[in-house]
A protein has these predicted regions:
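Non-catalytic terminal/linker segments enriched in charged/polar, low-complexity residues
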Residues: 1-100, 104-113, 128, 134, ...
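P-loop/Walker A NTP-binding module and the surrounding RecA-like catalytic core of P-loop NTPases
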Residues: 85, 89-314
């Protein structure tokens, strides 16, 4: 993916989550405490849970902070804040993976985008294509959401705007056939990346999940390694529902990555920590705005600082 200047402001984009967390922790970080006792750490754990970090991640973080306090004497609000950022960074680091093309990457690299309706999947598909394009790579898009005519039109509109070919058929067409045509086109043109936009679906919808399986089989027949990436798009504003969606798709489909979108408009961005803690799936990128350049590589340390309110990365 293309790099982004720090002036683009992840710190500012996560202000709603940071404000919600900071409001809850203001008494802890206000300098009123000479010593941080059990009551303070209990309150910290409650506030982390309320920020959608999840029970498991919140308990682990606070348990570690308690232990650190016993051995290193955390006695100031700033020391506690720094220790909190460090612990969140440690959890998030395991999910950090930038999606890049290597010299030995398959050609085309096939990326299948999946998710439920309304999470911004088609827009994220276009933004990802723009990122690869900005990095000097050729891209083809496959409009395999054939259940919604608007989805085909939306992707075609993005393709026209970006100058990226979109392989599509009519509304109601066989999505697997579209995927086949898209792969054949990408391979014949020597394209670097093929990104497939699939229909939004609930994991409990047997027919749509079967369709997704058919798309995967068709791609695998064309290239035994395809799809090389299966990326789930989730809406960060849904909080713990994003976690349940990710767990279900990981079990049903198998994922190589998760993209958390709409983080600029929610106070529930802490769910990224829960995803990193509870699922063995990377988070290659996050969505922090509506602009074409607002799909960012996920960077654990920067994200942790932006969540809690450490030194600005702007």
């Amino acid at each position: 993916m293309a790099s982004h200047p720090k002036s683009s402001g992840l710190f500012a984009r996560l202000k709603k989550t940071r404000a919600a967390l900071s409001d809850g922790l203001v008494s802890l970080f206000s300098g009123n405490h000479v010593h941080f006792d059990d009551a303070v750490y209990d309150e910290l754990e409650d506030q982390l849970i309320m920020a959608d970090l999840g029970v498991e991640a919140s308990a682990e973080v606070v348990s570690t902070l308690r232990e650190q306090a016993r051995t290193t004497q955390i006695e100031s609000p700033e020391a506690l804040k720094k220790a909190l950022i460090d612990q969140l960074s440690l959890i998030l680091r395991g999910a950090e993976r930038e999606l890049v093309l290597a010299s030995d990457s398959p050609k085309p690299l096939v990326i299948l985008m999946v998710g439920v309706n309304g999470v911004g999947k088609t827009t994220t598909t276009a933004k990802l294509a723009a990122n690869f394009q900005a990095g000097g790579h050729s891209v083809v898009l496959g409009a395999c959401d054939t259940f919604r005519a608007a989805a085909i039109e939306q992707l075609q509109s993005w393709g026209d705007r970006l100058g990226i070919p979109v392989i599509a058929q009519t509304h109601g067409a066989d999505a697997a056939a579209v995927a086949h045509d898209a792969f054949a086109t990408a391979r014949s043109r020597g394209v670097d990346v093929l990104i497939i936009d699939s229909a939004g679906r609930q994991h409990v919808n047997a027919d749509l999940m079967a369709q997704l399986g058919k798309i995967r089989r068709v791609l695998a027949k064309a290239d035994p390694g395809a799809p090389h990436e299966t990326i789930l798009v989730v809406d960060g504003g849904t909080g713990q529902n994003a976690l349940s969606q990710a767990a279900a798709f990981e079990k049903t489909v198998g994922l190589t990555g998760i993209c958390v979108t709409k983080l600029d408009g929610t106070a529930r961005g802490g769910v990224v920590v829960a995803l990193a803690k509870q699922l063995p799936v990377s988070i290659p990128f996050i969505g922090v705005g509506e602009g074409i350049n607002d799909l960012r590589p996920f960077q654990s340390a920067d994200f942790a600082r932006a969540l809690v309110g450490g030194k600005s990365i702007e």
